[in-house]
């Protein structure tokens, strides 16, 4: 697969993950009677993040490391790799465990969820996960822009 296709798939699946976890956030705020939809939404969000993770990793090994990174480091914005990519390389590790946690929470019964007083912590947790994913996306944009500036 070509670089643009991989980058597009990486971004597209990340957007699916973000969108579905925003949907999940709304579901937890609304406290649905039917819990099945929570599980489906959380699973699709997790799948989006997993596919983005795998495709991004393949792109990193196949293209970024050998081709793009040297261009960025020699270009007009070498800090893009030193700051944005180095941060992204570590922060992205949190996304899958966070998504799995949200999925596991979605499997609690309505009674378990209510009795555990998890509504506010879950809303804050999912909101934080979405914020982390959006920050990773912003870092990806910075890195991509730095490659184009060079």
Regions found by a protein language model. Name each.
Residues 1-150:
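Polytopic transmembrane helical bundles with strong interfacial aromatic enrichment
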């Amino acid at each position: 697969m070509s670089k643009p296709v991989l980058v597009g798939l990486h971004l597209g699946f990340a957007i699916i993950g973000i969108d579905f976890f925003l949907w999940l956030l709304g579901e937890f705020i609304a406290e649905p009677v039917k819990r099945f939809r929570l599980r489906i939404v959380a699973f699709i969000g997790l799948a989006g993040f997993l596919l983005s993770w795998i495709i991004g990793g393949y792109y990193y090994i196949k293209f970024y490391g050998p081709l793009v990174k040297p261009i960025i480091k020699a270009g007009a914005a070498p800090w893009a790799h030193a700051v944005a990519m180095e941060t992204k390389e570590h922060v992205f590790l949190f996304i899958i465990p966070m998504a799995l946690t949200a999925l596991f929470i979605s499997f609690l019964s309505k009674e378990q969820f209510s009795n555990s007083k998890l509504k506010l912590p879950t809303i804050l947790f999912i909101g934080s996960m979405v914020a982390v994913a959006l920050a990773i996306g912003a870092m990806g944009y910075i890195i991509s822009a730095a490659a184009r500036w060079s």
